[in-house]
């Protein structure tokens, strides 16, 4: 009877449309910083290739000891936060206690990666992930060895008992006193890609996640005074004795996260009939309106960009306590963490707003598209960083809007990338970059400014058509880089397809420069005229002085790697007159010569700032007075260095 019921469940699930389903129940022990959990996973193979193993992500084992891949690469530091606490208390783990498959005990068939001889031969992760001396396979991956392959259309029911201990929070998930942020907290099935096998990379410092869409039913039992926020919608809340159980349901999502704290303050709002919940710590009530305003700006902007409103039935914004900001700035489906400091920030300093918009935006460029964050970080971080700036521009106008300082969106990303002198491309796996800073620059900043340039080149209407097509074709799938590029090609054509593909897949830079801008008084004729008559010098000088004509020469140069792109050149004369020239981009440089009654004041390449990705704006303008030009250059470089300092502090890895 039990076996028949199990088969009935498998059949019912296979007819539901999704190939993955999680039913999870957990009990939180705040004193021990642990949860005891049980999950039932039903997984269906929807590929042509039989599956002989089932890998599980056990991400929280990244905090098991100081020799894991994550802690080896990070040294216990993430963004600006460090792993702290008493020696054993600061670490965490996810321990698999028992496994059954289709009702049969499979506990002996489960192995952590560290228990497997030559785990590289399983082909669940790439060989280059563990080539460094200090970086070896760890327990962030576990393998269930099946007795029989799961063929196409077949489903398997897996039951797992597990214990998770939270680490002291410094990187996304963990605890601070009685506050808990549960991200990547349960055993999660990797993504099966048929002939390519399982995609189940190790958990690196810079890599995030990749998962299949699933339905989740989750019960969370906590002490009665605790408030829980989670992915999905709350189905029920029941108190029994000194315990309270929350039940949540989420459909068609790629992850499930939750938070619990006995000091949460709660605020509610609505957007387009979508309920919005804000969880924030005591003392930050003055930020509530500001946080909801940013969230609504994000909802509006992403709907406008893609042509599709937020599709889920609820959204929760979590503002962690200031002492636990390691939990801030992280995305999960239907729930994200932002962050406000305990002190008041001027309304014109919109870094908290930027963080909220960015993290919400990952519900599109990560959660809805489910791109592979391990291998193509730019597809979520880069596209989403562009969309963040788009949201700031639409919702606020300026990123920084103070009486003495105005900084428009996209500026920090352009300045950030302009400081990078290497030749790496964004299209690399997250662990393959030479440094954390280069990963951030190429995964966030470079795609942002090249997408902004693409928008300027094709126009906002056509640009939004690209994203609308991308959503229509690839939402709720796992699009590849070529899928995105193909949408650019279909809407904007081959030229712009080549442009954005070159930007992402190579180390190319774009750099227009004014090579020279000079004026010379036209000299009077001397010697013999063209009829071989001697020229009367005094007469020529008098006539020339009356005319006083200048011969002007402006040379614009393409110093970058992108060819055949048009650029406009503005020439401003000292009398205020303006002249505009256009170069079609053919060749390496173009000279413009003309006569005028006034000399050149300055020449400006790309005055409308079409090329937001121009690598060096200092050389876009050249004054006829060289000393002025030197002063402009020094000022620009000083400003770039100062803003880059703040970029490193505020935007690395959000």
What is the predicted role of each segment?
Residues 381, 385-449, 453, 457, ...:
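Acidic/His/Gly-enriched intrinsically disordered linker/tail segments
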Residues 77-93, 97-98, 104, 134-136, ...:
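Extended, low-hydrophobicity, Ser/Thr/Pro/Gly-biased non-transmembrane segments
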Residues 189-198, 205-357, 386-389, 398:
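Hydrophobic helix-coil surface modules that form long, contiguous segments used
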Residues 230, 497, 510-606:
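Beta-strand-rich binding/interaction modules
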Residues 360-376:
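Catalytic Zn2+-binding segment of zinc metalloproteases
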Residues 55-115, 119, 123-124, 183, ...:
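Solvent-exposed beta-hairpin/edge-strand motifs
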Residues 13-36, 77, 176, 497-502, ...:
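N-terminal, polar/Ser/Thr-rich
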Residues 399, 440-526:
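Amphipathic alpha-helical substructures
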């Amino acid at each position: 009877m039990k076996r028949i019921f199990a088969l009935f469940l498998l059949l019912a699930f296979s007819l539901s449309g999704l190939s993955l389903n999680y039913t999870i129940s957990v009990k939180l022990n705040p004193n021990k910083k642990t949860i005891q959990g049980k999950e039932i996973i039903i997984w269906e193979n929807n590929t042509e290739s039989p599956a002989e193993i089932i890998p599980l992500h056990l991400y929280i084992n990244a905090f098991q000891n100081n020799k894991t891949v994550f802690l080896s690469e990070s040294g216990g530091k993430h963004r600006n936060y460090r792993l702290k606490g008493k020696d054993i208390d600061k670490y965490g783990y996810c321990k698999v206690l028992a496994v059954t498959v289709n009702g049969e005990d499979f506990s002996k068939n489960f192995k952590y990666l560290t228990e497997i001889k030559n785990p590289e031969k399983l082909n669940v992760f790439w060989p280059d992930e563990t080539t460094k001396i200090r970086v070896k396979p760890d327990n962030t991956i576990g393998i269930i060895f099946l007795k029989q392959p799961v063929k196409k259309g077949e489903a398997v029911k897996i039951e797992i008992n597990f214990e998770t201990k939270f680490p002291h929070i410094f990187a996304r998930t963990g605890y601070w006193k009685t506050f808990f942020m549960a991200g990547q907290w349960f055993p999660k099935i990797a993504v099966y890609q048929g002939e390519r096998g399982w995609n189940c990379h190790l958990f690196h410092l810079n890599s995030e996640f990749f998962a299949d869409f699933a339905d989740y039913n989750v019960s969370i039992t906590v002490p009665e005074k605790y408030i829980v926020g989670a992915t999905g919608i709350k189905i029920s809340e029941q108190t029994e004795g000194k315990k309270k159980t929350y039940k949540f349901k989420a459909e068609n999502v790629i992850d499930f996260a939750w938070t619990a704290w006995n000091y949460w303050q709660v605020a509610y709002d609505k957007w387009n009939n979508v309920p919005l919940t804000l969880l924030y710590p005591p003392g930050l009530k003055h930020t509530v309106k500001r946080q909801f305003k940013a969230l609504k700006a994000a909802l509006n902007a992403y709907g406008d960009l893609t042509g599709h409103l937020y599709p889920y039935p609820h959204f929760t914004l979590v503002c962690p306590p200031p002492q636990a900001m390691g939990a801030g700035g992280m995305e999960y489906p239907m729930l994200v963490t932002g962050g406000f400091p305990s002190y008041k920030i001027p309304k014109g300093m919109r870094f908290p707003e930027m963080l909220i918009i960015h993290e919400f935006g990952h519900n599109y460029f990560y959660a809805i598209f489910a791109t592979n964050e391990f291998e193509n970080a730019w597809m979520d971080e880069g596209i989403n960083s562009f969309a963040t700036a788009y949201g700031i521009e639409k919702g606020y106008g300026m990123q920084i809007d103070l009486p003495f300082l105005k900084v428009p969106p996209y500026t920090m990303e352009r300045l950030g990338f302009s400081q990078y002198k290497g030749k790496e491309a964004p299209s690399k796996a997250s662990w393959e970059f030479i440094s954390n800073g280069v990963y951030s620059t190429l995964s966030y900043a470079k795609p942002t400014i090249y997408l902004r340039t693409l928008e300027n080149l094709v126009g906002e209407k056509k640009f939004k058509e690209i994203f609308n097509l991308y959503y229509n074709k690839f939402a709720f799938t796992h699009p590849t880089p070529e899928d995105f590029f193909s949408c650019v090609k279909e809407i904007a054509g081959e030229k712009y397809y080549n442009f954005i593909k070159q930007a992402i897949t190579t180390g190319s830079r774009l750099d227009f420069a004014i090579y020279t801008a000079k004026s010379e008084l036209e000299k009077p004729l001397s010697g013999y005229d063209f009829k071989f008559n001697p020229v009367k010098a005094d007469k020529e000088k008098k006539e020339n002085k009356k005319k006083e004509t200048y011969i002007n020469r402006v040379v614009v140069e393409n110093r970058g790697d992108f060819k055949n792109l048009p650029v406009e050149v503005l020439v401003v004369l000292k009398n205020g007159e303006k002249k505009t020239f256009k170069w079609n981009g053919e060749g390496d440089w173009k000279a413009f010569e003309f006569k005028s009654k006034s000399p050149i004041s300055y020449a400006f390449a790309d005055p409308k700032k079409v090329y937001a990705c121009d690598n060096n704006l200092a050389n876009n303008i050249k004054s006829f007075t060289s000393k002025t030009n030197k002063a402009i250059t020094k000022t620009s470089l000083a400003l770039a260095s100062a803003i880059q300092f703040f970029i490193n502090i505020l935007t690395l890895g959000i």
